[in-house]
């Protein structure tokens, strides 16, 4: 019997595993991952941005964890020899309406304690000669990294401290009892843990349902499609270039990202995926589609964002529409500059009343902790999210009437934060 089993080998699961074994070095800990390697889904299919925390409601978990995670991610990379580029982010306004929205973002960045600089049109042009706009906000702390590399380093640390990673282990059933949790996999494996931690991303709601519980949310998969610019445009921008987001839209808009390998990507958009892990336009699951369209919450989201959703779908099917979104602030680009690049799928939790759950969300039972909503900036925030989960583990252990083996914490969660922010 394990003391802890963690489900999910993305960056949240690996961060949690690494920090949990640091706090409880004598614990028997296993991480189950359904793929043959870590970071195969959301972690390995995002833009790699180290976010600063510009957009998030002051005081929210997203705002707190993103600010802490920005520093912790860079510190972790420094400590483990992982390359990153602290290139900064430029938010660009291209109309009077966007200038008004940019002023609101300026106030929010102040409330979130983020260093930033206001630029007029001339100053913007001086910093970014190929970008057109009425003004911008420069955020120097934003950067770029390979979160696959970060996750791989976390996995190596976890294993070096005695943790066990079991790949090709897709969870098919959970049974919680008074002394622990039994975990069954499609491959025929059976594991038992005193405490279970689920960091299951696109499958988060299904793991809660396996316990016989109604999760109170459903995961809606949104595919984010990217292009890569032709190599001759690798120097077209000096920073990450973001449009000013439309408050009516749930996502940040199509942006230009300087990748860690020197290439520049365009994207992502946000298109409803008809399969939980539907990375290609043609990917379709009848059961997943029935589940999506059978959800009153998702139907309300689609109704509330009908116009923008149809626009996203049109631009997904028509490359010229996608291009126009980028040409608003980078008119130099043409259709031939947009080359194919792998898509990602976002796991967005939706409430029954049709609200996109805006903050990170965790659900606990006497023996389990579930990470239920961890969209962007979860990768940036992975280290503080992991520490937050470890704190929840400590609370759970203290409340258990029969906690199993006595585990002594070798260090506090506060010490974890300090270690990653030296």
Swiss-Prot record:
Cellular component per GO, a single term: cytoplasm
A Pfam entry, by short name: DAO
GO-annotated molecular function: (S)-2-hydroxyglutarate dehydrogenase activity; 2-hydroxyglutarate dehydrogenase activity; flavin adenine dinucleotide binding
Induction: Expression is induced by RpoS during carbon starvation and at stationary phase. Is also regulated by cAMP-CRP. Repressed by CsiR. Makes part of the operon glaH-lhgD-gabDTP.
Coiled coil stretches, renumbered: none
Family matches, as HAMAP family: L_hydroxyglutarate_dehydrogenase (MF_00990)
Protein name per its UniProtKB record: L-2-hydroxyglutarate dehydrogenase
């Amino acid at each position: 019997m394990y003391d802890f089993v963690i489900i999910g080998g993305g960056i949240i699961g690996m961060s949690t595993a690494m920090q949990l074994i640091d706090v409880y070095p004598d614990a028997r800990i296993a991480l189950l991952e359904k793929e043959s390697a870590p970071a195969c889904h959301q972690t390995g299919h995002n833009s790699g941005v180290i976010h600063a925390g510009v957009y998030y409601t002051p005081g929210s978990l997203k705002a707190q964890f993103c600010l802490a995670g920005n520093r912790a991610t860079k510190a972790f990379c420094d400590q483990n020899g992982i390359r990153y580029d602290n290139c900064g982010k430029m938010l660009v306004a291209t109309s009077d309406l966007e200038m008004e929205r940019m002023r609101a973002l300026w106030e929010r960045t102040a409330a979130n304690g983020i260093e930033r600089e206001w630029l007029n049109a001339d100053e913007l042009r001086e910093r970014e000669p190929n970008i057109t706009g009425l003004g911008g906000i420069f955020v120097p702390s934003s950067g770029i990294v390979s979160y696959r590399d970060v996750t791989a380093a976390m996995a190596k640390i976890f294993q070096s401290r005695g943790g066990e990673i079991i790949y090709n282990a897709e969870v098919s059933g959970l049974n919680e009892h008074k002394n622990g949790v039994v975990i069954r996999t499609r491959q025929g494996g059976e594991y038992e843990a005193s405490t279970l931690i689920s960091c299951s991303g696109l499958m988060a709601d299904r793991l809660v349902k396996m316990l016989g519980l109604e999760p109170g949310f459903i995961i809606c998969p949104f595919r984010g499609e990217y292009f890569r610019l032709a190599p001759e445009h690798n120097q077209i921008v000096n920073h990450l270039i973001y449009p000013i987001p439309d408050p009516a839209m749930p996502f940040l808009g199509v942006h230009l990202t300087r990748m860690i390998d020197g290439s520049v990507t365009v994207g992502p958009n946000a298109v409803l995926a008809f399969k939980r892990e539907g990375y290609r336009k043609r990917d379709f699951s009848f059961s997943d589609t029935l589940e999506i369209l059978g959800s009153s919450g998702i139907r309300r989201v689609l109704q509330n964002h009908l116009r923008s959703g149809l626009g996203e779908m049109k631009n997904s099917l028509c490359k010229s529409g996608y291009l126009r979104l980028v040409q608003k602030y980078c008119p130099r680009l043409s259709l031939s500059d947009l080359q194919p690049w792998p898509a990602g799928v976002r796991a967005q939790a939706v409430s029954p009343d049709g609200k996109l759950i805006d903050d990170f969300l965790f659900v606990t039972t006497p023996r389990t902790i579930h990470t239920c909503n961890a969209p962007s900036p979860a990768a940036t925030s992975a280290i503080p999210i992991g520490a937050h989960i470890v704190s929840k583990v400590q609370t759970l252990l203290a409340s258990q009437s029969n906690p199993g083996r006595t585990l002594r914490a070798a260090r506090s969660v506060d010490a974890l934060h300090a270690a990653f922010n030296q």
